[in-house]
Amino acid sequence: MTIQLKCLSHTPLRGINDPGAATVAEVDAVLAKAKAEVEAFDPELIVVFAPDHYNGLFYDLMPPFVIATAADSVGDYQTMTGPLSVDKDLALEMAKFILDSDIDIAISHRLQVDHGCTQTLEEMTGSLTRYPVIPIIINSVAPPFGPYRRVRKLGEAVGKFIAKLNKRVLILGTGGLSHEPPVPLLSGANEDIANFLIAGRNPTPEFRAARQARTLATGMIFGKPECELTPLNPEWDQNFMDLLIRGQLDKVDAFDIEEISKAAGRSTHEVRTWVAAFAAMAASGPYNAHQDYYRPINEWIAGYGVVSASQK
């Protein structure tokens, strides 16, 4: 049993609304190095903790956590479409273990996933199908949210399960860091928006294009005076990464959801995927972790970070 971890920000605006060439080159180099490390590790299983952005999960039934035994990418923005190579039998075994660990997790036998899951998988492996994968989606954009303590405990259960496997396992956490894209809230939404948030599966190409155009338009003004959304918060991002790197996972239990939203943006809660990933890593034993990269990138509406960890 050998376990490695990569936690990365994702951004659908990468390649669509890029910052300066020097910053793009920095990120490309960091991702190329991370991908080479994954290839050298040659995982026999990837467990990916990811959010959804109202592409697969909606308020008609919004689980805090869901594990997929089969998953297809919707191909939003510039991501690949098609099925992921989900290990169905192992996913079911993991789901049972999580439930036996007193963590209520939903199970999907036909889950649609978006860039929140697939972009990092593509960046790290070049494919949706190269390695067996188990996707675990953590609600990070559709309030109300459960406490971060529950996310940590989910990660611990996953980590205890994979520690029993005689496999090379890569844990991916994808999301955050500080950011607030134009994701609508159900509270106060008009009828059309509310209907989409409740049951907006399989939108028309025109609807998806219009939605993506709004995100692009926001990226073009994000961080400027005319943008009313919460700006990026590099200090918050750095403190969060440092906490995980130092292994102080118990501190996330005190995280206040509203305070995080106000300080770093409503979609910052995608860092729940990082919390779960590091909790899974810690459950397998002591680890060494380091920060590979960080830069606040307004054009991508993201505090963009990359962190890696391996067993001691």
Curated annotation (Swiss-Prot):
InterPro entries: DHPP/DHXA_dioxygenase, Xdiol_dOase_suB. Its EC number is 1.13.11.16. GO terms for biological process: 3-phenylpropionate catabolic process. It catalyses: 3-(2,3-dihydroxyphenyl)propanoate + O2 = (2Z,4E)-2-hydroxy-6-oxonona-2,4-dienedioate + H(+); (2E)-3-(2,3-dihydroxyphenyl)prop-2-enoate + O2 = (2Z,4E,7E)-2-hydroxy-6-oxonona-2,4,7-trienedioate + H(+). Pathway: Aromatic compound metabolism; 3-phenylpropanoate degradation. The active site is at 115 (proton donor), 179 (proton acceptor). Its cofactor is Fe(2+). Keywords: Aromatic hydrocarbons catabolism, Dioxygenase, Iron, Oxidoreductase. It comes from the Bacteria. Belongs to the LigB/MhpB extradiol dioxygenase family. Homotetramer. Catalyzes the non-heme iron(II)-dependent oxidative cleavage of 2,3-dihydroxyphenylpropionic acid and 2,3-dihydroxicinnamic acid into 2-hydroxy-6-ketononadienedioate and 2-hydroxy-6-ketononatrienedioate, respectively. This is 2,3-dihydroxyphenylpropionate/2,3-dihydroxicinnamic acid 1,2-dioxygenase 1. The lineage of its organism: Bacteria, Pseudomonadati, Pseudomonadota, Betaproteobacteria, Rhodocyclales.
